[in-house]
Amino acid sequence: MAIPVTRMMVPHAIPSLRLSHPNPSRVDFLCRCAPSEIQPLRPELSLSVGIHAIPHPDKVEKGGEDAFFVSSYRGGVMAVADGVSGWAEQDVDPSLFSKELMANASRLVDDQEVRYDPGFLIDKAHTATTSRGSATIILAMLEEVGILKIGNVGDCGLKLLREGQIIFATAPQEHYFDCPYQLSSEGSAQTYLDASFSIVEVQKGDVIVMGSDGLFDNVFDHEIVSIVTKHTDVAESSRLLAEVASSHSRDTEFESPYALEARAKGFDVPLWKKVLGKKLTGGKLDDVTVIVAKVVSS
């Protein structure tokens, strides 16, 4: 069961460039021009968004354990959370935490105390979440003047494409292979202070691809670029990316990004299979959530 594609146009409001994050040492900057070259007046920017989600084949009935939200507030806000499936071993539904986390983020996005800051929004949404469980999260907020602010905990990801090339990508945060940083109901896990924060200058025509690890574990960068370049409609490209990821995840012979990383980290088939010429291959079965957003003039 695939969640139907949705499309929306995000309106604009009054610009603001302030970012007052409590952990500035973890903030990365990507600027394409010197401050003297930045024009004080420019067209306001917003997002045209397409979303598609496909649950894990064994989790279709409950809709999977990923969750997401998209808001039309200010230049546009979007986020993905991936519930950690290991909680099922303790008879806890892993989807509850991720869904409540996203519901809280959506509700609090225009809260005055959040100050349109991804760190504060992650913190307040996490604090308000009462379900047992844990989740990875990525959240992006667009300033109408073309500043994209990103907060990431774990291995959900975001890539920024311009003129057919990836010019920026978040990096996954992991304790070790296949064990990502995560927000949790347990006090020993990560918080917003452990998040990776980035500030990226975007321009009209840029395309943002955001998703859970079910996308990036199964789809290579060149496939993402090819699909987004050939299919400029965001609803269509999000659907195609999700379908390719889901297809690769079920292919036991596919040389997926996940399989390549696993082998690079020392994980492989038993020795007797290696003698027979076998190696670890295949995609990673998982929920797949894809958000594709095009930067447009308001």
From Swiss-Prot:
One of its GO terms (biological process) is cellular response to light stimulus. Its EC number is 3.1.3.16. Mn(2+) 1 binds at D82, G83. It is an enzyme of class 3 (hydrolase). One of its GO terms (molecular function) is metal ion binding. Its cofactor is Mg(2+); Mn(2+). Binds 2 magnesium or manganese ions per subunit. InterPro entries: PPM-type-like_dom_sf, PPM-type_phosphatase-like_dom, PPTC7. It catalyses: O-phospho-L-seryl-[protein] + H2O = L-seryl-[protein] + phosphate; O-phospho-L-threonyl-[protein] + H2O = L-threonyl-[protein] + phosphate. Residues 48-295 form the PPM-type phosphatase domain. It comes from the Eukaryota. One of its GO terms (cellular component) is chloroplast. PROSITE patterns: PPM_2. Mn(2+) 2 binds at D82, D213, D286. Keywords: Hydrolase, Magnesium, Manganese, Metal-binding, Protein phosphatase. Gene3D superfamilies: PPM-type phosphatase domain. Belongs to the PP2C family. This is Probable protein phosphatase 2C 26. The lineage of its organism: Eukaryota, Viridiplantae, Streptophyta, Embryophyta, Tracheophyta.
